[in-house]
Amino acid sequence: SNKVHPMLMTRGVPGTHDVKIMLDFFKKSKSKNFKSIKLPSFNKAVDDRSLKKSWYNIKEQPDVIIFEGWCVGARAEINKTLKKPINSLERTKDQKLIWRKYVNEQLRTKYKKLYSQLNCLIYLKAKNFSLLQKWRLKQEHKLWLNTKNKSSHKIMSKGDVINFMQTYQRITQNMFKFAPKYSTIILNLNSNHQIKTIKYNK
């Protein structure tokens, strides 16, 4: 965030993940000479990785790996579509398109290499972006209820969540449009997180 753009202080968008450690995990998990792997866990309440003593220790070679994340499989946009801001955050905080171009370039390069590790792509598609915001607010409220020492944790307010979600909006809406065309399986969800329909692409 200091070198590129302050908006990269907010985790989640391409360019804020440790792609190297993920690629290393895939490489080691596929190795014929498999050895145990230490895998980080994430603590949302403190908005950072858990201490190493809480990391997962994978002792046996996995048969199946489910690689989950909100932007898994996302693809880069064409540069000209980046010019028009889609929300107030882009309009006020990224007037020179530095953040948008950086995130898009990450998708085009490092994340393309990462997603090439996948054998198939299962896309869970919500009805719209406002529904995703509603679900995220509910998730944060549950986190607040389940956290004992609230003063020492980074639990977000409603306004924080809305701002946080704006950093995700561009890629999410791009996936709404294009991911159903290239995903292996598309699970269309209703407003209660239930699978409404399933589509298979050959």
Residue ranges and their predicted role:
Residues 1-47:
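Conserved nucleotide-sensing/catalytic segment adjacent to the nucleotide-binding pocket
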Residues 6, 56-57, 107:
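Generic hydrophobic alpha-helical membrane-segment signal
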Residues 64, 71-202:
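Conserved NTP phosphate-binding and transfer environment spanning the P-loop NTPase/kinase superfamily
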